[in-house]
Amino acid sequence: MIRTMLQGKLHRVKVTQADLHYEGSCAIDQDFLDASGILENEAIDIWNVTNGKRFSTYAIAAERGSRIISVNGAAAHCAEVGDIVIIASFVTMSDEEARTWSPKVAYFEGDNEMKRTAKAIPVQVA
């Protein structure tokens, strides 16, 4: 059996640019890519917390330390500057591998200040 698992996630980053006329993609600060394990040109899903839209694109690197999250091309219709989004990538693996797999998650606040990283998502309590 093959399972699709969360590989990396940027939780609640703020969109800093939306460029309709730039060639597709989502430019992400290289520090953020490193923290989440997302690679340049990797397929990503973006879930817009602000407006509820969900879309897919691919990641490209933005300047390290810039805190840039730039939604580009047609995807710019799905996000505006200031929107809060979650960016995730997924990986496929065997059932055996999935049972011990840990994603790389980075949590953000304010103007894309990385507050912490984790290897798991906390259990949701009642």
UniProtKB/Swiss-Prot annotation:
Record: active site: 25 (schiff-base intermediate with substrate), 58 (proton donor)
Subunit comment: Heterooctamer of four alpha and four beta subunits.
Keyword Cytoplasm: yes
Broad class of where this protein is predominantly found: cytoplasm
Family to which the UniProt record says this protein belongs: Belongs to the PanD family.
Function, as annotated: Catalyzes the pyruvoyl-dependent decarboxylation of aspartate to produce beta-alanine.
Cofactor annotation comment: Binds 1 pyruvoyl group covalently per subunit.
Gene expressing this chain: panD
Chain positions recorded as substrate binding sites: 57, 73-75
Protein name in the entry: Aspartate 1-decarboxylase
Subcellular location: Cytoplasm
Annotated metabolic or biological route of this protein: Cofactor biosynthesis; (R)-pantothenate biosynthesis; beta-alanine from L-aspartate: step 1/1
NCBIfam families: panD
Residues where Pyruvic acid (Ser) is found: 25
Keywords: Autocatalytic cleavage, Cytoplasm, Decarboxylase, Lyase, Pantothenate biosynthesis, Pyruvate, Schiff base, Zymogen
Modification(s) after translation: Is synthesized initially as an inactive proenzyme, which is activated by self-cleavage at a specific serine bond to produce a beta-subunit with a hydroxyl group at its C-terminus and an alpha-subunit with a pyruvoyl group at its N-terminus.
Annotated organism of origin: Salmonella dublin (strain CT_02021853)
EC assignment: 4.1.1.11
Keyword Lyase included in the entry's annotation: yes
